A protein has these predicted regions:
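Glycine-rich phosphate-binding loop
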Residues: 132-170
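Glycine-rich oxoanion-binding loops at beta->alpha junctions
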Residues: 73-75, 115-136, 181-182, 198
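Short, structured coil segments at secondary-structure junctions
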Residues: 61-63, 160-161, 191-193
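Glycine-rich phosphate/diphosphate-binding loop of Rossmann-like nucleotide-binding domains
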Residues: 84-126
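C-terminal binding/interaction regions
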Residues: 93, 97, 134-138, 142, ...
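Long amphipathic alpha-helical segments
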Residues: 1-65
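Short glycine/serine/threonine-rich phosphate/pyrophosphate-binding segments
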Residues: 29-31, 98-103, 127-128, 147-157, ...
Length: 218
């Protein structure tokens, strides 16, 4: 079936951001057409939630395509114009099971040339792990916190550090964890004031929120 591609090429001019492509629910044919359309405008392709079958197809088509399997993301083309800023973003994750979402956020920021660092496996079940990294994390200007299960990490970080905090509930856990809904509700009802909360597993959205913040304060 043919379909009209209405890609938002003006988004970069309006917002300084590009439109990412959601790979999960698109066919290989749709992705190929979208990539061709985007690249014809000398724009960068950034695909989220893409599996290895679709990624390998695009890797065969484009020499400069890169598949980041752990992040389930694929890029084609040169990096975007670098964001001229000395501001830094820390991405903090509760456990290694949160890694895909953490790396999605990190890759999105790195594509824009943002200086960022991931702090992996510092969840509240072993609070000493977070405390041992706290001095280093405090050197960053914006914090993204990714956590599944009960999602308490965002509240703890929000009670210890003053930076803008973007919380990402992760669909890790079983039973009452409800694919991230418990973490989402926990973050939304946090007693640490001023925490911004993204949708479940939205690492890319968290990265774009962080990008808006550092652009506005640079």
């Amino acid at each position: 079936m043919n379909f009209d591609i209405k890609f938002d090429f003006q988004r970069r001019d309006r917002l300084g951001l590009i439109e990412a492509i959601w790979g999960q629910d698109k066919s290989i044919d749709q992705l190929e057409r979208l990539c061709g359309n985007v690249l014809s405008k000398n724009e960068v392709v950034f695909i989220t939630r893409i599996n290895s079958e679709k990624a390998n197809y695009l890797l065969d088509l484009y020499d400069d395509a890169r598949f980041y399997e752990e992040a389930n993301c694929l890029t084609i083309g040169k990096n975007l114009n670098k964001i001229i800023t000395n501001k830094k973003v820390a991405i903090i994750s509760g456990g290694t099971s949160d890694l895909a979402i953490t790396l999605e956020a990190q890759l999105a920021l790195e594509t824009y040339g943002v200086n960022c660092q991931s702090f992996i496996d510092v969840g509240v079940a072993g609070l000493h792990r977070l405390m041992s990294q706290l001095e280093e994390i405090n050197k960053y200007d914006v914090l993204i916190v990714c956590a599944g299960m009960e999602g308490a990490l965002a509240t703890v970080v929000g009670g210890l550090l003053a930076q803008p905090i973007i919380a990402v509930p992760v669909s890790v856990g079983y039973g009452i964890s409800k694919d991230g809904e418990t973490a989402l509700n926990s973050m939304l009802s946090s007693c640490s004031p001023g925490i911004a909360v993204m949708n479940i597993d939205n690492g890319y959205g968290a990265a774009m929120a962080a990008l808006r913040i550092i652009k506005s304060i640079s």
